[in-house]
Amino acid sequence: MTRQTPPSVQIHHTGHDHWILSIQDTSGTVFLLDSKNPRQTVSASTQIQMSRIYSSNGNMIPVNLPTVQQQTNSIDCGVFAIAYATEFCFNQYTGGKGLTFNTSVMRDHLLQCLSNKQLQPFPKVQPKKILK
């Protein structure tokens, strides 16, 4: 792995059958988006990968762990990582509430993007309006 300059995105394998996304925004701040980690912990493998990618001297770096939409099964982590990466590239999304992907069409959307050889933002669920 080689050092990257911001902005940058990287999909990581955690070493535990799981895929996550790291982002370094234009200010150099690093975010870790994990669709199946409500405790927000970082594996040793991921820490090593991120220090090699984002640290100028290979030391550990501070990482922000924002709240993100959590997957409801054990197989969608890769699709979520790609969706988050795409959202960052199009809209500078670095995590946080307010973004909910339409999980029922995520895989079909990814297949369509790959077929077209062009990523597009993943479909989202619109927030429900509250009637008064």
Predicted regions and their residues:
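Cysteine protease-like catalytic core of ubiquitin/ubiquitin-like
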Residues: 1-113
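C-terminal helix/juxtamembrane-tail motif
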Residues: 105-132
